[in-house]
Amino acid sequence: MRRTIVTALALTLGLVAATGLRAADTAQPIPFGRGSWAKLWSEHAGKPTVIHFWGLTCGPCIVEMPKWGKLLAERPDMRLVLVAADPLPQSPDRVNDALQRAGLERAESWAFADRFYERLRYEIDPAWSGELPRTLLVAADGSTTALPGVADLATVRKWLDAQPRSPN
């Protein structure tokens, strides 16, 4: 009996340790709730930033994500922020897995974490009805260019080339 308990305890501790290692090895998306837009905006103020809204439930988004991964590999200086803006909050593990498959694991990642997603969209842009994908090109001076739908990455590259280089 004692041997069974010790074995069960060892197996349990092994599973806990393995799960802990997995969590430490993979960055989870930051929960995007009320006030997150203001925080994200202030953290990137004064720095050219590409903010890409996508979703696990958006077919064109999933097809497009590997292209963003290639662009990030090509332009490691690009400040890319990804926001999973699904109407219903998605599992952080599913979001993370999709980003890893697309080569975007090193990009800053957020995920809508409020079931009242209309409120989150309104904080971002009162005129945005929630269509995905959507990309915002935010210049150092705060001026913003919105690219609705699948982004033309040639346009994004051209915009990046026109931005002043700044330290991360």
PLM-predicted stretches and their roles:
Residues M1-L9:
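Bacterial N-terminal signal peptides that target proteins for export
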